[in-house]
């Protein structure tokens, strides 16, 4: 079950390059870290075991032992995991690079077999070609890969993934790329590779090869924000940042194919890159559509719509004594932008509701309350216009000059007053609002900090290391630089 891990252990002494590339955490004496109860394939050692979250991308793809190396498939250091990684589209040339990598690092020849025979300690099964002694020689060349789908990007990590497991909680899926290469040609490569093995080992090798090389591909899974670890999030000044660790090298390659070309023809460059690499920490902002959706869902869950019926003059998030409006603990870990949006939305709705509906106290039970929660939950979905229209109708609009309008005369604070003027592009606020104006104000408050349409879909920790370095040099890793302020603010 751990053929790839065993091969890395035994082949690490074959060459100087192998000594550098085949050191994986699963073969070390380190104590494993705690498990996250997620069972799957570690993409570094390929064994089926319990996984934990990677320091480099915050996804669960590394085992409790390999996590000690702090390696990620998004590093730019040419370690073994990086060498097995390719980004879509997958071509025959890229697949040939994987085959050449296996042949280079895990060769099978009479000399290699004799070397392993001499290395095996004298035991009963020494000359019986038992699998337990020679498992490292049973590593066939297959084109199976674990695939991470980051919306438009697909990243393939090739490896020998044995066994079967449910993939419910895994951020990746296993696919077979043999049809993109040549099935008969790959068969021939493996037949030649196993020809030197004893008969008993040949049958096991062939069984391993055909069992995995003919596996059907799984349907790819889109990576969502819920797949990422929250353990490496820090909260400074009520702004969330993510700590990311990446392995860096000063050497660069134009493409992964060029990297593999140097692996074959310029090993000294690879060794120099490995020996001069360093582990660097990045503090990236966590502003993305996935997190905004999660925060808004939580905001709607904790929302106390009774506030719009109340006479409170304090912001909605600062009500602590009223049992109908108290959200004391809801914003303890909430992003400050969510709190600002919540305060302005409920203050505006309070002013509209108190101006049009005869309601006296926040203890009142009103039919509009579920619509307030719906407005928050639908604030960044296509249903927002329908929800706003229902909310407008709940304000008892009256028809004036063939238009439905609502009154607006209840008190609001000066910051909200200024913001609404900016949204409507007017010098003074009217005492009535049409549906279009009501709609524009709510959307303007929701979008006051960021344009949801232009947010990244996933956190920055899914980007390649080179891009993180570039963003850091430009000073754009911090959230302040990534906030897409609404155009209306620039027009003020």
From Swiss-Prot:
Give the highest taxon in the source lineage: Viruses
Q: Which cysteines bridge via disulfide bonds?
A: none
Q: Which UniProt keywords apply?
A: Host cytoplasm, Host cytoskeleton, Host-virus interaction, Inhibition of host innate immune response by virus, Inhibition of host IRF3 by virus, Inhibition of host IRF7 by virus, Inhibition of host RLR pathway by virus, Interferon antiviral system evasion, Metal-binding, RNA-binding, Viral immunoevasion
- InterPro entries to which the protein is assigned, alphabetical: Rotavirus_NSP1
Question: Where are the stretches annotated Important for cytoskeleton localization?
Answer: 82-176
Which residue ranges does the UniProt annotation give for the motif pLxIS motif? 483-486
Q: Name one GO molecular function term.
A: metal ion binding
Q: List the residue ranges of the region (Zinc-binding domain).
A: 42-79
Residues spanning the membrane: none
GO biological process terms on file: symbiont-mediated suppression of host cytoplasmic pattern recognition receptor signaling pathway via inhibition of IRF3 activity; symbiont-mediated suppression of host cytoplasmic pattern recognition receptor signaling pathway via inhibition of IRF7 activity
Described by its record, this protein's role is as follows: Plays a role in the inhibition of host innate immunity by inducing the degradation of key host factors required to activate interferon production such as IRF3, IRF5 or IRF7. Associates with components of cullin RING ligases (CRLs) including CUL1 or CUL3, which are essential multisubunit ubiquitination complexes, to modulate their activities.
Family statement:
Belongs to the rotavirus NSP1 family.
Q: Which HAMAP family match?
A: ROTA_NSP1 (MF_04088)
Identify this protein by name.
Non-structural protein 1
Record the organism. Rotavirus A (isolate RVA/Monkey/United States/TUCH/2003/G3P[24])
């Amino acid at each position: 079950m751990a053929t790839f891990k065993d091969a890395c252990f035994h082949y690490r002494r074959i060459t100087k390059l192998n000594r550098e590339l085949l050191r994986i955490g699963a073969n070390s004496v380190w104590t494993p870290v705690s498990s996250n109860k997620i069972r799957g394939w570690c993409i570094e050692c390929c064994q089926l075991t319990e996984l934990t979250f990677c320091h480099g991308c915050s996804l669960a793809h590394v085992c409790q032992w390999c996590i000690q190396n702090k390696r990620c498939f998004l590093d730019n250091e040419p370690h073994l995991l990086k060498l097995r990684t390719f980004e879509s589209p997958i071509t025959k040339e890229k697949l040939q690079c994987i085959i050449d990598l296996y042949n280079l690092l895990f060769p099978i020849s009479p000399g290699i077999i004799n070397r392993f025979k001499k290395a095996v300690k004298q035991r009963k099964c020494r000359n019986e070609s038992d699998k337990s002694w020679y498992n490292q020689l049973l590593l066939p060349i297959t084109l199976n890969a674990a695939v991470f789908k980051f919306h438009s990007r697909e990243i393939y990590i090739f490896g020998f993934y044995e066994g079967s497991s449910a993939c419910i909680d895994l951020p990746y899926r296993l696919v077979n790329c043999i049809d993109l290469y040549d099935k008969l040609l790959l068969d021939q490569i493996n037949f030649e590779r196993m020809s030197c093995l004893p008969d008993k080992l040949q049958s096991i090798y062939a069984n391993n090869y055909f069992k995995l090389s003919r596996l059907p591909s799984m349907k790819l899974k889109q990576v969502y924000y819920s797949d990422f670890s929250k353990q490496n999030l820090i909260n400074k000044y009520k702004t969330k940042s993510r700590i990311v660790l990446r392995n860096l090298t000063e050497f660069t390659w134009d493409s992964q194919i060029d990297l593999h070309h140097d692996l074959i023809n310029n090993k000294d460059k690879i060794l120099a890159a490995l020996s001069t690499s360093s582990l660097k920490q990045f503090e990236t902002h966590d502003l993305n559509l996935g997190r905004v959706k999660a925060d808004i869902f939580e905001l709607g869950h904790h929302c106390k719509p009774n506030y719009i019926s109340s006479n409170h003059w304090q912001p909605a998030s600062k009500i602590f004594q009223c049992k109908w409006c108290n959200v004391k603990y809801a914003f303890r870990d909430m992003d400050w932008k969510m709190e600002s949006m919540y305060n302005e939305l409920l203050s505006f709705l309070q002013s509209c509701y108190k101006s049009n509906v005869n309601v006296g106290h926040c203890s009142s039970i009103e039919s509009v309350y579920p619509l307030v929660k719906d407005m928050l939950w639908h604030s960044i979905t296509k249903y927002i216009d329908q929800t706003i229209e229902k909310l407008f109708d709940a304000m008892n609009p009256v028809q004036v000059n063939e238009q439905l309008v609502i009154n607006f005369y209840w008190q609001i604070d000066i910051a909200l007053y200024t913001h609404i003027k900016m949204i409507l592009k007017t010098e003074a606020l009217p005492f009535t609002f049409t549906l279009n104006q009501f709609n524009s104000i709510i959307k303007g408050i929701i979008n006051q900090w960021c344009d949801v349409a232009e947010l990244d879909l996933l956190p920055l920790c899914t980007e390649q290391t080179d891009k993180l370095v570039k963003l850091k040099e430009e000073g754009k890793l911090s959230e302040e630089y990534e906030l897409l302020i609404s155009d209306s603010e620039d027009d003020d």
